[in-house]
Amino acid sequence: MKTYDVVAKAIKAQGVGHCFALLGDGNMHFAGALAHLDVSFTYARHEHCAVSMAMAYARVTGQPGLATVTCGPGLTQVMTGLSAAVRARIPLVLFVGESPLRASWYNQEIDQAPFVTACGAEYVRILHKPRVTRQIQDAFSRTQMSGIPVVIGMPFDLQESEWGNLNVTIEAASDFVPSAGKVFPDPGVVDAVTALVAQAKRPVLIGGRGAVLADAGPSCIRLADKIGAVLLTSLPARGLFHRSIHSLNVVGGFASDTARKACLDSDLVIAVGTSLASHSADAGRLYPNAKILHIDTHPIIYQQGRVAAHHHLCADAKIGVDAILNALGDIKGCSSGSHEWRDELAAQQKAAEYPDALPFQVAPDVIDPRQMI
């Protein structure tokens, strides 16, 4: 049995059922062994695409994505995708191999760790056969717990070596990763932010990917109906509020003219499960008159060089929204926002031929890209 067989078995044991790959010297034997274990493969024509597909797989399945490219120039090609995965906190494991230990010279040799850490990802270098299975388990557990991608580098001559009489103990990271459970808000903080919500006259509620994962969409719609808020989403959460007639689609750079007007006029933005990135706030210019309430398991104060939120509720997205709804019911004479205001905005959105009024030339027989947003 070769060492790459053990590597493949250890990765298969982590619940991996699919791998996105572009093969080369540093990963071909490992990939072959993994395929023989009935792990299906999707092959890319560019290394960046392999990582991007693994990112999409992780987002759809909720499980860490697996990609593999060769060492050296194969790794340098994935830096854009790897950086994007770090910023989006997408759990991902990338197996890249490494230049051979015993070669006196190797044309594609580079110091890989600095490239990986420059992207914000973590690098695990496997150099000792007795630690192979444990380091692979650790890589998967770290990405599952932190959402930070982990890159595994292992010299390909070490991969091709005989395993010998060493014991093989393989354990799944999922058996050791603790369940995070739901995050419940502090009652005192709920009362404080509820008072803020009750006073809002032109509220806007924005749902992000965290709201999608927490199944907070229906609760957000109920809160919006209660306080007279219009509904928007970040681009990754597009469609979350499609059942509401008061949904103005996405916020940020792709926002419609009507959505932008709602944000500019709003006095309170309730951001649920979104990272409050610069794109969603038009670099902070989109809400000039609004206080921002962030409901998230990891509330953000500063984001990308600006103050992102003024008020915070640390909670699971659905639980936090439901807590505010319940607290609003206890406030006598709670003044909700202007339902007439949001009805007018919804009517304007429906009447618009396109989300924005900017001139845009569309060639004959070509789909207008605005129809995709």
Per-range role (PLM):
Residues 253-303:
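Phosphate/diphosphate-binding loops
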